[in-house]
From Swiss-Prot:
Organism: Frog virus 3 (isolate Goorha) (FV-3)
Acidic residues bias: start-end ranges: 236-261
UniProt keyword list: Early protein
One family name in Pfam for this protein: DUF2738
Highest taxon of source: Viruses
Protein name: Early 31 kDa protein
InterPro entries: DUF2738
Region (Disordered): 230-261
Amino acid sequence: MDPTSFDKTKLCFGKPTKFSKVAGAHIINIRYEDKVTKAKVPLSFHTPILFSFGAKTSSFQDGDDNWSMSLMCYDTNKGPSPQETAFIKALEAIECRVKKHLKDKDVKKATEMYQDPLIDMMSMFYRKMEDGVVVPDRAPALYPKLLKSKNNPGQVATGFYKFVRGKEVKIPVVKEKCRVLCDLAIDSIFLGAKPSIQIKLVDVFLVELIGERKKTLKLSKLPSAVQAEINKYSADTDEEEEEEEDNAEDTEEEEEEEADQ
């Protein structure tokens, strides 16, 4: 979904269900009502092109590898673009609806959780703080989780792709600084020690790998005299290597003859 077409009134919440892996925890699924079919479908957004420090892994209590990927919501030097502003506003609208839902008396009764101040503290974004105050002119960041493979434990199921000579190809997990376009899924609310909105990366499209150093010295761009000098000594090196190989073979033959005698 394009964030500009998001309608917060179409957001739907499932009934709280117990999360068996964590004692006392609950999960509330988040869905979106399709305007045409009225079906309740998973909610996902196509992000603008965003800067990332790359995917990182860390180990938690369950011992499995858990990956996340930073997404800076805009360039602080340029300020947010219209697309980035729409993206942030859509996420803020979801956050607002989630908080309102968690404060509903029936939800509180079903989950037996959370005073309103704790709900109000919940945020999808990481914002830099100093002395308890948000630092102005600093872009908010997201840290969505990468999907885990159900069939291959420990492996990432989120797809990473890029264009190579006009063709889309699958690539390994990107761990360096980069600019990416993502399919971002917002699938549930996790109710544990504190409430949190679960954000996951379904697919990541690599636009630019910033951490990769590009070669600046090209033989074809050098003056012809310089190219000739390089080629001259390159040829000498090849001849020296061949001569060394021949000498080594002669030495081996001499040693074999001495051994036979």
